[in-house]
Amino acid sequence: MVASARVQKLVRRYKLAIATALAILLLQGLVVWSFSGLEEDEPGEKGRQRKPRPLDPGEGSKDTDSSAGRRGSAGRRHGRWRGRAESPGVPVAKVVRAVTSRQRASRRVPPAPPPEAPGRQNLSGAAAGEALIGAPGFPQHGDTGSVEGAPQPTDNTFTPKCEIVGKDALSALARASTKQCQQEIANVVCLHQAGNLMPKSVPRHCQLAGKMSPGVQWEEIRAQQPVGGPPVRIAYMLVVHGRAIRQLKRLLKAVYHEQHFFYIHVDKRSNYLYREVVELAQHYENVRVTPWRMVTIWGGASLLRMYLRSMKDLLEIPGWTWDFFINLSATDYPTRTNEELVAFLSKNRDKNFLKSHGRDNSRFIKKQGLDRLFHECDSHMWRLGERQIPAGIVVDGGSDWFVLTRSFVEYVVYTDDPLVAQLRQFYTYTLLPAESFFHTVLENSPACASLVDNNLRVTNWNRKLGCKCQYKHIVDWCGCSPNDFKPQDFLRLQQVSRPTFFARKFESTVNQEVLEILDFHLYGSYPPSTPALKAYWENIYDVADGPGGLSDVLLTAYTAFARLSLRHAATAVSPLATAVCRFEPRGLPSSVHLYFYDDHFQGYLVTQAVQPSAQGPAETLEMWLMPQRSLKLLGHSDQASRLQSLEVGTEWDPKERLFRNFGGLLGPLDEPVAMQRWARGPNLTATVVWIDPTYVVATSYDITVDADTEVTQYKPPLSLPLRPGAWTVRLLQFWEPLGETRFLVLPLTFNRKLPLRKDDASWLHAGPPHNEYMEQSFQGLSGILNLPQAEALEEAARRHTELTGSALEAWTDGELSNFWSVAGLCAIGPSACPSLELCRLTSWSSLSPDPKSELGPVKADGRLR
């Protein structure tokens, strides 16, 4: 009775608050209902809205040698300003100060779609699932992984053929960005709900019970014994993407032999790499490029389709009589010589080498998502619901890097065995199908006894760093990726207990020294006078790609780099030579390269066509822009000495713990991250303060750094646009400085690839409304931080919002010159300017000699290296 009276009293006291809460809930319900349609995002959002994540939370971490980790854990929809505080692989940086995140309602699909309108055609021509049943495992018109590439144009409506009720399917329909993809998803789900998509059972032909897991040991003495019969010949399938042509050439140089065959598939999105590979292949009869290309996304069914089609090609190329199929990526490298590999495979010429996950099948099935239905479209793998594993077979899987015999490849490609046909159908709708398809087919086939549980690779797995759900933007699941090898990992490359012939991953932009060590271990050192052994170049823009791949920030920066360099050329020579060394840029830069030396980023190399101001023919110059160091380490105590570096950038890679935006170029609409590196030492709590160019304190937050923390990083949810100019990030302990760095928010001279107009500049360069970067104001800290009065800076910032044309370029160039310097210029051809050296004679130009990545003619021993 007393409790009831107390409840009534509380209700009377807080009835207004309760009524308000109920009203808010009602309003939220109306908002969610209003978003339940499938209309596209409004164009006024300028493309900055993010798609909602998968719906339910995940489970567990990843199995050995399998890339699937756990179910997508980003199911709850976060607002566009949601920040993160995390320290990959080390204790999490704890954000002590509260920051408010904004949330938007996610869209949903009505649970009962209307019936199909009479006479209306399916967007994909035929139901996606029906077409795939007719030809399982082969690309269909409009598939992401098909030769034709992106989905075909269609009308703006789609009509499900059934009532779609599963939450995964409804979530996928709400998030798919094209109507064709929505139609494909609906078709697949309806077929699955009707029981007409997945095989119920699959025949098993293996006469052995249970899982096959024999191993083969590496014996150095036995490997050197003579081989009975002719040595095996290998078909290497190189699956590549990106722009790292020099690393690909280095790999090909290491594995090449004239007795082997090399078939290269370049992702359809990697046009620069494709052009380079086509040119490379023209010089070697046993190197070919697939005449078709697919978009192969991580975890997608398109990767398996690509492998199956490549295998068929390799079987049908006249004169290519190979014995083993080995797939490699551009981030692989051999760990033993070709002679050792050929000798080993010749002794085991009837074996298929695939790495299995282990003994716990049920755990693997759950973590790999094999009991879930997936479909690939819009360059995304959509989770559509649950399914049953077919009865009658043993399901296996692990790594999607393998060594297969020709006879097994022929069986997979040509057989009409229901085992293969039905498993193709099953794996068409499977996440990471290449990690399980070949394992499962082999383990249930008549050749099951040929399985060896070893894929002859060593992979640099670091679960704490590699399993960060880094692929959740392209797949509704949490995946893992191996880390790059570094010199400290070299002992792992020298496997002695089991045969390993390849290792992954290697990235020259992350660490090239480990490749030098491995290359020396295999083939000996280059002559002492060999140039560029510690240098690495990687193209990031080529004029043949068109400006579409460039952001406004990069377009602004590259053109400004060219102007700065040409002014430098005109002022760096004697007065008598000034006239012939004065140039004007012609058009946009023709190429841009990243330049590294001794595993340190050295800057950008910009190639630009120019016209001499004096009479003379047009020339092409390459310009080296080097970043200027802006870090100051200020602390002297034991705790303060822990700070090693403080950086601000974008494209943070939690696996390798670096910024993939190597030059740190960012603009007003970017969302920067502050990262700190620490030495081991006593625990400490530090305060991070962000200050904009007009001394507005944008934000402040605390981070806790434990004794063994190595890296902390956090992206504050700042309101956009950021004010252009020089920003400062200070790191303090008890308000005493530990360190400070400056970074540039670049004023843009382009917007949507066109010169910036005044009406765009008025908001793009003005900073956030009312100078409020956060809902909470931190301007009260200006006194503690001893910030000066900023009236003059505020007035200058206001005037900058009115700039366009040459005045805007002058402001941009001035800001950029405070953070970048011209380190070199060279001429690609003859130049009238006497101070310009030929690029091929320099040590830094992208046109200078690079013997380690140059292929050359085949040697007498059949090799290139």
Curated annotation (Swiss-Prot):
State the Gene Ontology BP annotations: chondroitin sulfate proteoglycan biosynthetic process; glycosaminoglycan biosynthetic process; heparan sulfate proteoglycan biosynthetic process; heparin proteoglycan biosynthetic process; proteoglycan biosynthetic process
Expression by tissue, per the entry, reads: Detected in brain, liver, lung, kidney, heart, spleen and testis, and at lower levels in skeletal muscle.
Q: Which residues lie on this side of the membrane: Lumenal?
A: 37-865
Q: List ligand-binding residues for UDP-alpha-D-xylose.
A: V239, D267, T296, I297, W298, D400, W401, S481, R504, K505
The record lists its disulfide bonds as C162-C190, C206-C448, C467-C480, C469-C478, C581-C833, C826-C839
The EC number(s) given in the record are: 2.4.2.26
Which segments show compositional bias classed as Basic and acidic residues?
Answer: 53-65
Organism domain of life: Eukaryota
Co-factor binding details: Active with either Mg(2+) or Mn(2+), but activity is highest when both are present.
Any stretches that span the bilayer, and where are they?
A: 16-36
Q: What happens when the gene is disrupted?
A: Mutant mice are born at the expected Mendelian rate. Their livers display strongly reduced levels of heparan sulfate proteoglycan. DCN glycosylation is altered and lacks chondroitin sulfate groups. After 3 to 5 months, all mutant mice display increased liver weight. At an age of 4 to 5 months, about half of them delevop liver cysts, due to biliary epithelial cell hyperplasia. At an age of 3 and 10 months, mutant mice also display increased kidney weight due to hydronephrosis and impaired renal function, but they do not develop cysts.
Q: Is Transferase tagged as a keyword?
A: yes
Q: Does the keyword Transcription apply?
A: no
As cofactor, the record names: Mg(2+); Mn(2+)
Q: What are the boundaries of the region Disordered?
A: 39-155
This protein's pathway reads: Glycan metabolism; chondroitin sulfate biosynthesis; Glycan metabolism; heparan sulfate biosynthesis
Please outline how this chain is modified post-translation.
Contains disulfide bonds.
As for what it does, the entry says: Catalyzes the first step in the biosynthesis of chondroitin sulfate, heparan sulfate and dermatan sulfate proteoglycans, such as DCN. Transfers D-xylose from UDP-D-xylose to specific serine residues of the core protein.
State the protein's name. Xylosyltransferase 2
